[in-house]
């Protein structure tokens, strides 16, 4: 007689033939290491059919925000306001304002008004960033961002006014200017007869 007739090795295991997969592991164990839906994560980043989920990735958001920010740097001041406003939905407005003010003052320069407004915008942005470290109030973020955007709008308008004044005060090239001295008086080198110089005795 066969040995297996008296001894069945499957009797020594709690899980043998006919046991389903769900009976092998508890629910917590399945949630910890077993993949779902073909390994695609749908909770945070979208699944295979959720193409809009790609915009939730930080790398894509950062890339689009940086592209708009660079376009804002090389655009007219009024258009740059719109670019920064759109970029604020992708990147923090505080970082955009600080970088824009620093770069603009470096390659544009400006008078006392623009320099002062840039300092005010930078200080306000730094204060907002510091407060956000300790608080996470959505109401404070909305109010502070509105105030910061108003200050930034005033700064950009000062730049627009400065560029307008520079366009008016255009220097005339030297070849088109008259550099010869001029004094008032008679420039004709001939004697102009007068009434007293006429000789009337001959008539």
From Swiss-Prot:
Modification(s) after translation: The 23 kDa precursor is cleaved into a final 21 kDa form by the OPG083 protease during virus maturation.
Record site feature (Cleavage), residues: 16-17, 185-186
Transmembrane segments: 66-86, 139-159
GO MF annotation, one: DNA binding
Region feature (Binding to OPG125 scaffold protein): 1-38
Recorded superkingdom: Viruses
Mutagenesis / variant outcome for changing residue 203 to F: Loss of phosphorylation
UniProt subcellular location: Virion membrane
UniProt propeptide residues: 1-16, 185-203
GO cellular-component term (any): virion membrane
Quaternary data: Homodimer; disulfide-linked. Interacts (via N-terminus) with OPG125 scaffold; this interaction helps OPG125 to associate with membranes. Interacts with OPG140. Interacts with OPG154; this interaction allows OPG154 to be anchored in the mature virion (MV) membrane. Part of a complex composed of OPG144, OPG153 and OPG154.
Protein name per the record: Virion membrane protein OPG144 precursor
Gene name tied to this protein: OPG144
